[in-house]
Amino acid sequence: MRMKRIHILFVVIFLLCLRYGYSIKKKRSPNNKNRLFINKRLKYINSKIISRRKENYVKMKMTENKVKGKDIIYGNECRNELLKGILTVSDVVKLTLGPRGRNVLLEKEYGSPLIINDGVTIAKNISLKDRKKNNGVKLMQESTNISNDKAGDGTSSTALMTATITKKGIEQVNRNHNPIPIQRGIQLASKMIIEKIKSLSTPIKTYKDILNIATIASNNDVHMGQIIANAYDKLGKNAAIILDDNADINDKLEFTEGYNFDRGIINPYLLYNENKDYIEYSNVSTLITDQNIDNIQSILPILEIFAKNKQPLCIIADDFSNEVLQTLIINKLKGAIKVLCIVTNSKYISADVGLDLNNLHNNMSSFDNNYLSLLGSANTLIVKKDRTSLITKEEYKKEIDERINVLKKEYEETTSKYDKEKLNERIAALSGGIAKILIGGNSETEQKERKFKYEDATNAVKSAIDIGYVPGGGVTYLEIIKSNFIQEIHKKIEEDLQISSNNDEKKYLELIGNLESEMELQKMGANIVVSSLDVITKQIADNAGVNGDNVVKIILNSKDKYGFGYDVNTNKFVNMVEKGIIDSTNVIISVIKNSCSIASMVLTTECMMVDHEKKDKGILDSSINSPNYLSKHRRTYKHKLHDDEDTDEDDEEDEDDEDDEDDLDDDDYDDEDEEDEEDEEDEDDEDDEDSMNDEYNYDE
């Protein structure tokens, strides 16, 4: 009986334990809603961890590629790196030299590629990843740009000549020769050769001379040459030529009444948002004064009216202060007003109709009502870097004719030769007008390529009118070699270095050391320049498919008079001038001058400092989105992320992360309300930052 009671008691206790134990377990177990919330929270936290790891991975790669200090290169290595960049530009640009020059295709970020043979445009588009070599590229771009700005042509010849002189000079410097006397020899040879070329020049006299220069400069396009020659034939040597696009496939020449003068845009910021290298406004008003505009208040009444009416305004003055320029530029950049500023540095332009700014400021009320009567106006205004063209309205033809008659009367009365020349130029400019060449083409690419040719040809003619012309095809360069001009240069060097009784010169000789060594090195520099003059003719022949070395030998060994050369179009040796193959003297001089200048600078460059940049070691790993990325990324980049945790702890943490991610991938959950998510994100961000700092140590 007793045992039975004990048995019953145990059964009751067991049942009670089962009952209450199940209840506790049930209470401790979360319901479905809580479990969804917890799992979603864990998923969000781990996604933030992965996102944070991605972000730090990218930051780490960006940090690797950031510039860290400077690389400093000395001596021969420095010059050799510059030479590689110079030769890179030369090897590309020289392919376009001559009437049989090849084309170069330029890839554009948008639109179809551009196929051209314009040397300066090709050089501008060359850029190398290697910073050291790219400095050499920039030097070549500077050389070609100067030739293009000063002479309008000869950029391909400049690039080739610069590379040749630089290469020969560096070869001598690398043999431990002193570059300073070599530089002196190069500079002296450059000056003497330029003077020699000027003595060989022939002035422009006839229509045929202009036609020949324009044809050669436009890559032997006779039709282009005729259009340009016709423009100069009608308007004279001071002709203003404007290039524009034509909807037709053919080129067209038009003449309009207008006036142009050699003054251009005062500040490049005025070109902002114009998408071209000049500004063109229609129905523009002009304010002309012979005063300096030093205070913005003096022209404020005009600016307010034109800003309100959104009309373009051109201000032509003697000079502008920095304050006025800054104010005008800022307002133009904001789009508040269309304004142009042109500096004349001269008083004649407004001697008759110039506006008195003091009277303008004192009579603001009257100006508000009749401002147009105080200002000039033009149908079209085109302002380039160094030239302004005003196309007048038909209604002003009577006033223009009256002004021309006044100038003619002044021309007859004056006795000064200088005044007669200037008055004649003004009469021609007012009466001649402006030539407008409308350029056609079968495609946009062809149209742009033809426009580059027209620019070269018009610039070449303009420079030739100033100095004259010489035989083309590189014959003038070969004449320097053929006439044994190097002996005159050597003689000049010896005369400059000969010993005299002058104490100052004796001290100089003591400083430079061996006189014979100094003399020989200067002669070496002169020899480098003269021996490089044949590369132009060689390359022209090579581009035409002929052996350039043989062509040069035949010309140098010929007993014909100056002008004998090779015509690649007919494959015959002819008199270049008689065949119309001529070059602008200014172009030839510019090639010699700029080539020797850049080469001299490179030879005396002993050190180069460039930004140091690490090479990119790869791109973002695609496995970054995989479940195993956390542990893989941590092991691979552990040493780069400055993580000092123990290896065992790393493995445990990575395994926990992987387990959490695997669990999360098995379930899909619904989105909750936006307010709840924002609250969770705020809390989780703090938790994540703490966990990232404590567990992964990324932010150190």
Curated annotation (Swiss-Prot):
The record places the transit peptide at 1-9
What residue spans carry the Acidic residues bias annotation?
644-700
PANTHER family linked to this entry: 60 KDA HEAT SHOCK PROTEIN, MITOCHONDRIAL (PTHR45633)
Picking any one GO molecular function of the record gives: ATP binding
- The protein's name: Chaperonin CPN60, mitochondrial
Q: State a GO cellular component annotated for this protein.
A: mitochondrial matrix
Q: What is the recorded function of this protein according to its Swiss-Prot or TrEMBL entry?
A: Implicated in mitochondrial protein import and macromolecular assembly. May facilitate the correct folding of imported proteins. May also prevent misfolding and promote the refolding and proper assembly of unfolded polypeptides generated under stress conditions in the mitochondrial matrix.
Query: Which residues does the annotated region (Disordered) include?
Result: 636-700
Q: Pfam families per the record?
A: Cpn60_TCP1
Do you know which SUPFAM superfamilies this protein is assigned to? Answer: GroEL apical domain-like, GroEL equatorial domain-like, GroEL-intermediate domain like
Q: List keywords of the entry alphabetically.
A: ATP-binding, Chaperone, Mitochondrion, Nucleotide-binding, Stress response, Transit peptide
Q: Tell me if Nucleotide-binding is a UniProt keyword of this record.
A: yes
Reply yes or no: does the keyword Nucleotide-binding apply.
Answer: yes
User: Which family does the similarity line name?
Assistant: Belongs to the chaperonin (HSP60) family.
- InterPro entries named among the record's database cross-references: Cpn60/GroEL, Cpn60/GroEL/TCP-1, GroEL-like_apical_dom_sf, GROEL-like_equatorial_sf, TCP-1-like_intermed_sf
Q: In this entry, which stretches build a coiled coil? A: none
Grouped into one coarse class, the protein's main location is mitochondrion
GO annotations under biological process?
protein refolding
Q: Which CDD domains match?
A: GroEL
